[in-house]
From Swiss-Prot:
Listed Low complexity bias regions: 153-165, 402-418, 961-970
Listed EC numbers: 3.4.23.-, 2.7.7.49, 2.7.7.7, 3.1.26.4
Designated name of the protein: Transposon Ty1-PR2 Gag-Pol polyprotein
Organism: Saccharomyces cerevisiae (strain ATCC 204508 / S288c)
Entry-linked InterPro entries: Aspartic_peptidase_AS, DNA/RNA_pol_sf, Integrase_cat-core, Retrotran_Ty1/copia-like, RNaseH-like_sf, RNaseH_sf, RVT_2, TYA
GO CC terms in record: cytoplasm; nucleus
MF GO annotations: aspartic-type endopeptidase activity; ATP binding; DNA binding; DNA-directed DNA polymerase activity; RNA binding; RNA-directed DNA polymerase activity; RNA-DNA hybrid ribonuclease activity; zinc ion binding
Amino acid sequence: MESQQLSNYPHISHGSACASVTSKEVHTNQDPLDVSASKIQEYDKASTKANSQQTTTPASSAVPENPHHASPQPASVPPPQNGPYPQQCMMTQNQANPSGWSFYGHPSMIPYTPYQMSPMYFPPGPQSQFPQYPSSVGTPLSTPSPESGNTFTDSSSADSDMTSTKKYVRPPPMLTSPNDFPNWVKTYIKFLQNSNLGGIIPTVNGKPVRPITDDELTFLYNTFQIFAPSQFLPTWVKDILSVDYTDIMKILSKSIEKMQSDTQEANDIVTLANLQYNGSTPADAFETKVTNIIDRLNNNGIHINNKVACQLIMRGLSGEYKFLRYTRHRHLNMTVAELFLDIHAIYEEQQGSRNSKPNYRRNPSDEKNDSRSYTNTTKPKVIARNPQKTNNSKSKTARAHNVSTSNNSPSTDNDSISKSTTEPIQLNNKHDLHLGQKLTESTVNHTNHSDDELPGHLLLDSGASRTLIRSAHHIHSASSNPDINVVDAQKRNIPINAIGDLQFHFQDNTKTSIKVLHTPNIAYDLLSLNELAAVDITACFTKNVLERSDGTVLAPIVKYGDFYWVSKKYLLPSNISVPTINNVHTSESTRKYPYPFIHRMLAHANAQTIRYSLKNNTITYFNESDVDWSSAIDYQCPDCLIGKSTKHRHIKGSRLKYQNSYEPFQYLHTDIFGPVHNLPKSAPSYFISFTDETTKFRWVYPLHDRREDSILDVFTTILAFIKNQFQASVLVIQMDRGSEYTNRTLHKFLEKKNGITPCYTTTADSRAHGVAERLNRTLLDDCRTQLQCSGLPNHLWFSAIEFSTIVRNSLASPKSKKSARQHAGLAGLDISTLLPFGQPVIVNDHNPNSKIHPRGIPGYALHPSRNSYGYIIYLPSLKKTVDTTNYVILQGKESRLDQFNYDALTFDEDLNRLTASYHSFIASNEIQESNDLNIESDHDFQSDIELHPEQPRNVLSKAVSPTDSTPPSTHTEDSKRVSKTNIRAPREVDPNISESNILPSKKRSSTPQISNIESTGSGGMHKLNVPLLAPMSQSNTHESSHASKSKDFRHSDSYSENETNHTNVPISSTGGTNNKTVPQISDQETEKRIIHRSPSIDASPPENNSSHNIVPIKTPTTVSEQNTEESIIADLPLPDLPPESPTEFPDPFKELPPINSHQTNSSLGGIGDSNAYTTINSKKRSLEDNETEIKVSRDTWNTKNMRSLEPPRSKKRIHLIAAVKAVKSIKPIRTTLRYDEAITYNKDIKEKEKYIEAYHKEVNQLLKMNTWDTDKYYDRKEIDPKRVINSMFIFNRKRDGTHKARFVARGDIQHPDTYDSGMQSNTVHHYALMTSLSLALDNNYYITQLDISSAYLYADIKEELYIRPPPHLGMNDKLIRLKKSLYGLKQSGANWYETIKSYLIKQCGMEEVRGWSCVFKNSQVTICLFVDDMILFSKDLNANKKIITTLKKQYDTKIINLGESDNEIQYDILGLEIKYQRGKYMKLGMENSLTEKIPKLNVPLNPKGRKLSAPGQPGLYIDQDELEIDEDEYKEKVHEMQKLIGLASYVGYKFRFDLLYYINTLAQHILFPSRQVLDMTYELIQFMWDTRDKQLIWHKNKPTEPDNKLVAISDASYGNQPYYKSQIGNIYLLNGKVIGGKSTKASLTCTSTTEAEIHAISESVPLLNNLSHLVQELNKKPITKGLLTDSKSTISIIISNNEEKFRNRFFGTKAMRLRDEVSGNHLHVCYIETKKNIADVMTKPLPIKTFKLLTNKWIH
């Protein structure tokens, strides 16, 4: 703070009390907000201490002897030497005299106009006119913290103020903010007190102790003006000064009034939070105290609901009342009135011996027929009981409290008592919020008779609903025999003699009448506060008076013992005859026996037995009606609970909720069986089983021991298997409490590393683990049976377990009617591949000892192999098991090898028939393979199958060759011969293989040339109307329809052997199987479900059937399907392709490279087609096709070593391990400022002021929302460190230019025990938002955007958490307890989600869409919620306004954009810049955001001043050489990659779906930041900068469309190189509008293009179904779902019923599951040409022309 001077005001002399600090005492970067309340208190203490040490005698003092006047008098003092203030420029007490004040004169003589002082501090000068702090005293900010708050003295201390003379008077600090005014006023008042002006300070009633003189008024005005500049005054202060600028006294009076109000609220909150009750005081007094506090807080705007109040009350209960905490903790809707009923019941039970009450406790959980309610008045509320019973047929019943018929009750009626002594009560104020006024309470000096009656007084009862009195001479207008039943707290009847009026004559000379009941059967005369409230009279226990609502005092309240009383002297007597009233028959009703008493007497039998016994007179002396059965149902006998304790019952079907709550493979049961003794060491002794709760799918794993690492290996395996094979994440695993499950290693692995909740069984409750226990029992039963049946040794016991598991997974459950495999989405078990356990077989010995040694070894089949397509077979002679397919079944009736009779072999027809199809399948493949072995080739055919399974081939055997033809009979013989040999089947099975297309045909084998051949390559079926042996000059070749790679590969279908003298080269088909011809289409579904884009068999020649012409197969059942599916494609943003002219093919042998030529991977991470076959009919591409326009001259951009952009896996890269560790330590990108950056050291003054304003706004909001407990500060040493959360202020500038400050918690270092990891913080999914926007455009919806300020602070926090105040506040050793969900906490998001979700459902009538969190809807409005942002969609704008009105009742809701205009409206929704014209179009972009963010990335933009036309280059590959850089440079580059790819990912997944392939591929190289990777990343950012103005364009759907159309377009790029996986991509469209896209690597390794395409489609189906459900929920129109792919072979597999196509274990399972999903979800599978497949941009880099062609229809 800079020093100030008043050189411009010469009239201000040495009498001025100005304060300042010189520039030498304050640092240059002093924080302007460092002057906090705590610092001001420190200053007060130091000032008071310093002043109290200096005293003078009256003789030496200039203070007059008049004790009622504290104004200083003139005194002769030496003139100042070097300034107006001697003694180190500090103003002494004697200098504040009229000699200095006379300069001011009368207030009318003020030498300058009011409040014209400059708002800035005065610059320092050589002759400063302000006092300085002496070094001995110190600055106000350097004094230690005071022990307690300061208080101001009242009039009683005025005399001492006069006599004490203080040498130094410390001036108050300068006011720097309107928010600091309350604290500043306290220091200013302290300044006045230290200046001997304490007598002029207003007291509680707003008046000073003595009058103020003109000189004092002038001094008061000038000092206030100097230290409180006008620009920092609150509005209410300015309003007072605008009327009278010298009325400082009014300002002080109002400030003191505000302080007193704040003090009362603070004291009430502290009192309520620290309630204690043990029954030592009457329950009525305790109830009155609590309810009065709650009433005051509610009237002051601090709402205390029933739930919070009950928790605070119960927390303070002790002794006999403590059990109420546990008996009522499940009652969610308990009220304060109900709780006090229980407290009263216990209290009265304790007083039973004195008041003759029954000696048993009333059950707190009993249902009550009465309730308490708060009267809805503006005055303090009075608690009353409802006088109505639940049964309206009975007469009215009133409830009275403190009822007693004790004979000790006094009956005298004395209207006068001795004068009560009052005892002052000093209100402790920890926060120094009041001025120290002392309040008094009228109490009777009697404390030892808490149960005695105060004679001549009425007891004030807040619990009584009626007034009762024993004396009759005060009752007016009495009537006998009233039809009123009165009961006490124990529901006992009180006889009533009469009813009348009770008339009061109060101090204000007014008469008031209330109803009264007469009864002599009570201990005290009760005055009901409820009836007083009905006549506008309330009891103020703060002032201890009865008063009206306008504040008129009627009568004093006397506290005697623990109760409050009102004198009877205010009652008016009546002339009624007492005998008239008392002559009423008062027969006491018969009292019933309490059930607990009878229960204990009859040996703790249950109520049903006792009741039945009494009804049948097996127990005499009393009847069933003599027992009070009201509490029998809910009564809990503690002795019975202890003595009869049993295990809880397991209800049948109790686990159904888990099956409904969890998805498949999310909830597992596991158990371990073992050990099995007397086994060889190689055999497992244990096994561990897993069972899925939903599907009942089982897994078993062998174990040799139960060590931690063994169990951990199994858990790692099963979790990885479920994640990769089923795309599921395990959430819960239930297990017993064995040490193998409860050890720290496994617990850490499950919870901390995988986020899995371990669910353990409770102690001695094995039945709770029934799923796993029953499975083990079943498997063991099967094991014993299998071993007995087969006669195999016991050490093969686990093989029997595994065989049983395979079978059990395939058997249907009687309940679900499905098997576990079907529930899991797997195909059924092919029993033809299964052998009986222990089936005798002969295994081929592939490595015999000699050539004459037998080639077969006897063995026993155990179970199918888990790791291959073979079978696990036990060989007794070798004492081992083998995994093989080279075996032959011994077909005999005997099942055991030791019983086998080789001389009596019989043919087992059943087994042969069962496995016939399987052996036929294997034999067919073996025949084909044997034929192919005779084909001569110049390359390795097997490698071609593995590396190029996608290339379409026409397998030509010698049967069709003129030089080497084979008769049909030869084939038949070979087939029979080969079928009996043990040739291993091929590893991969083509899904298109069946008996119809693999067995040789006589017709085909005898025909030398074929005129019409169809090939089922990756592109589907193509007609080849070309003779196979025609000369090349006349031959025509076909173009593969699958052009998904970066180059087009075309192949010749036939060669002329006569002219070329070359052997026919086979061309492989999809999947690596050799097809000699096209399979016959036998599936009727093929013609029904697929739209065939290839020509029919009788179609025209190929030149008239180009790829863009659609010629569907004409069948009687395909017309409607064709129309439906063509309508799906009609509105899609597909490119328009120009017609292509026929192409002449050159001589293939001139361009055909060697078959084994070097193969390269595709660019930018995609693995394209290998160039083993170059395009035979290829032509030179134009310059535009090859041009990329990315020709920046960089040394690293060379193509000498073209390799994949995939991370190198075959080489060890330097720093790879260090990279993984280093990335974890790299700090995230910080876009915000700290406090010191934004304020303390900020040199931009204007920005600094805006941040200061934002800071104060945030602090006020935190206080307004009651974020933390402001009543108590905690010491750090007393709190558990893990419950302490660091906090900080962060600052940032928003996109709209506003400056924002946010107080946040450091949730990144929050301890896991302080939050529930299972809670989820949900936000709206981007697909849900895009879907809602698309439907809004098609349906002319209004779109309204809202924002809820400080949303998280509306959610309460359940955990006990403390935060450290920000460091700049100087409270390093203190903590404050959180009450609200502060921003930054782990649980804040989940808490807010639950809060707003509950409000939207209950108050706004919304419901959340199942499966789509944060999407709410009703019949008119749809809401998308993203934290505190809300997007409302509705056809009627009034419906949106109605929701907004409801939200504003609870939350601070801002309307960002109402959306009512019919012109184009611009939105900024979750980062998307949207332009929307209702009923016409919608454009989505991020131009402004990218323009702001990209230049901050420090990327060299436009290196050659030209724009890029594509984001990447085809043919450019990353060098895989080792990366050798130092550690610091490595971290820096990784950090840079994170920033670049992070921004690109954000933009890509928002709307730039055309960039997702490049983003996904480069993201895999963040840990490999080579120069080449960085350059490619720069090019991507450069392309984003050049195209930052591009937008995703949507147009309104045609109004004639009857339904919604949801389409997924799929594509895949096959990865056919070792160590690399395929790339898959999907684009989703709703009514022709692109709403999302995905590009990623395949999670499974694919062995062919067809498998990659199937995997891509299968990945799109779940999201497609989810989107379909969302669309149907938001829009009730019918929906048509379509799947588009450019692979006809994939479509053929999906719609086929041929089970032979699903032999492959993984591929077959996925294909079968996909087929079921397509059929079950009514998906239309359509074919789309590759050149029109817009999903092609998601799987590979494309040339500029192709890239533009595929994207310019939907993004431009």
